[in-house]
Amino acid sequence: MNKVVLDCCIQKDVKLFDEVANFNVSAITGQYKCIDNTMKNRFTYIRVIYPHQVDERITEILQPNSMIRIYGKIDSEQYVTTSNKVVYNKIICADKIVRIRFNQDIQEYVEVI
């Protein structure tokens, strides 16, 4: 029920270890209309955890500003801020990560093999 497939851009703070990778991504999560009636994309920043062996292929894919497709499950984390508020963030526990690129002919993102 909480499975998700997400196309997103990797942010700068990629942390790779032998058995886990974690990083932030920005994903287009909708559109909104501006005062001048133009439509803009709405971006959401999401923490991603890849709890599998980090091999050379994953290291090559997880470069800042790369476009990736994530297959995984939505979860959440909570922490206490300095003002003692409890904050809940959405995170994705990734099962599969693949590089994507924009195909001009079909106007969609496609997986790079």
Give residue spans per PLM region.
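Single-stranded nucleic acid-binding surfaces, predominantly the OB-fold ssDNA-binding core
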Residues: 1-113
